From Swiss-Prot:
Species name: Diplobatis ommata
Chain residues in the propeptide: 182-184
Lipidation (S-geranylgeranyl cysteine): C181
Protein name: Ras-related protein O-Krev
GO CC field: plasma membrane
Subcellular location: Cell membrane
Length: 184
């Protein structure tokens, strides 16, 4: 079974943990408890292929930025999350993306831009078009709006990253070994 190392990045309070826990455990975490680093494993099937996802839920706060290079070096796919209710969280993602590209030393990194908390439409300050435009600027990066609370596009975030990784490095099809018989 192929393993995938996915990393969830973004500013503090955007809902990285809520998205991850909703995906892995199917529950919504109401209380905000800042993360230092949490790792989750979940077995899923994407496009008829069994996959083991290792999801790293990272700290959004500035005091843990030294750990980021390591996440970025080891990660295969990245969800860059902002809150549609806070413009600053959207603005912070440009630097994060540039850091990923620098650490990976390539422009071709499986990545998805995620506008979280789309259930809070009344509090929206970042328009959907802003997200779409930024994704276009980022070499047509994938983009979704999500809500951990309302379970909107939660699975799709992680499945999309798996598909991007598979496109970059296709899954080896299992070849049946042919038994050979040699007569002496």
């Amino acid at each position: 079974m192929r393993e995938y190392k996915l990393v969830v990045l973004g500013s503090g309070g955007v809902g990285k943990s809520a998205l991850t826990v909703q995906f892995v455990q199917g529950i919504f975490v109401e209380k905000y408890d800042p993360t230092i680093e949490d790792s989750y494993r979940k077995q899923v099937e994407v496009d008829c292929q069994p996959c083991m996802l290792e999801i790293l839920d990272t700290a959004g706060t500035e005091q843990f930025t030294a750990m980021r290079d390591l996440y970025m070096k080891n990660g295969q796919g990245f969800a860059l999350v902002y809150s549609i209710t806070a413009q600053s969280t959207f603005n912070d993602l440009q630097d994060l993306r540039e850091q990923i590209l620098r650490v990976k030393d390539t422009e071709d990194v499986p990545m998805i831009l995620v506008g979280n908390k789309c259930d809070l439409e009344d509090e929206r300050v970042v328009g959907k078009e802003q997200g779409q435009n930024l994704a276009r600027q980022w070499n047509n990066c994938a983009f979704l709006e999500s809500s951990a609370k309302s379970k909107i596009n939660v699975n799709e975030i992680f499945y999309d990253l798996v598909r991007q990784i598979n496109r970059k490095a296709p899954v080896e099809k299992c070849k049946k070994k042919k038994s050979q018989c040699t007569l002496l």
